[in-house]
């Protein structure tokens, strides 16, 4: 990670904290918040039941540029294409709970329409029995 990316991540993390400081957070929201703010080395594990009664298990990586927290902060949080707010990020689990799913060999893509916006959450499927599903991205249809 270069210095410019580090500076952007620091600025966006501060903006994220400022945006959510007055919200009452659920336990789930707090876990997402902690992943985005504290970014410990160990990934955060999530287990969510979707509307089809499938239990979806995945990790949210906090230290990789190409997926998870850093990808969302750099590419989609208050950004250009696919813009999402801190509030929407805190509630990304609702996209799995309430959204439609499309599964291919590599990914589960959940799509959920709310307030005229379309949100997508992509979970990369594990490659082996010992592997782990990884949250790749979360974004909207905002341009």
Go through each PLM region and give its residues.
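Ribonuclease/tRNase effector modules and their secretory precursors
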Residues: 1-143
